[in-house]
Amino acid sequence: MEFTIDNTKVFSVDTGEKFNEKNPSVILLHGSGQSHVVWSLTTQFLSGENYNVFTLDLPGHGNSEGASLKSIEDMALWLNKVIEHLGIKQLSIVAHSQGCLIALEYANKFPKNLQKIVFVAGSYEIPVNKSLIDLALSGDMESLNLMMKWGYEKSKQFIGGNPLQKILNSPREVREVLAVDLIACNNYKNGLNAVKKIT
């Protein structure tokens, strides 16, 4: 499914099911440098359980157009525009890593629509190693390997290799997508206040 927010194309996985107001709605938010691809199995499962599932690509990520947004606050405002455009009145958000920060800030600014937040490998703040940011800013593809190495235990093996290398294919994408995301995560400082407001 494609639609337009702020004159820019937004992509969400089309599950083949029509929106049903009687069914619960869930938005899946990916992490830094990622896309809807990381939620493929989750999207299928939730759709099969009769959820209205919206698996979004953030601006500049995956199949969504535009530049990557530079702050978590801007991403939360964008998310609200998406939710309003889709006509969702009540929803849950399942979020991974950076997506958790976006979900927190959304809950802080727009609590009335939100029923639940599920964190997957998330926290109220995500400080990022300066060396990783510098590597990503330089467009070095090694930043993808380091991100996976620091994020997972040594014994963890990925079938088909590092999933980030399947999403980010060039030094330009590393600079313009991953680096921007990492800086946004590192700069976000409102998480603790947002957590305290969740009831």
Predicted region positions:
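Conserved alpha/beta-hydrolase "nucleophile elbow" surrounding the catalytic nucleophile
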Residues: H30-S32, L91, A95-S97
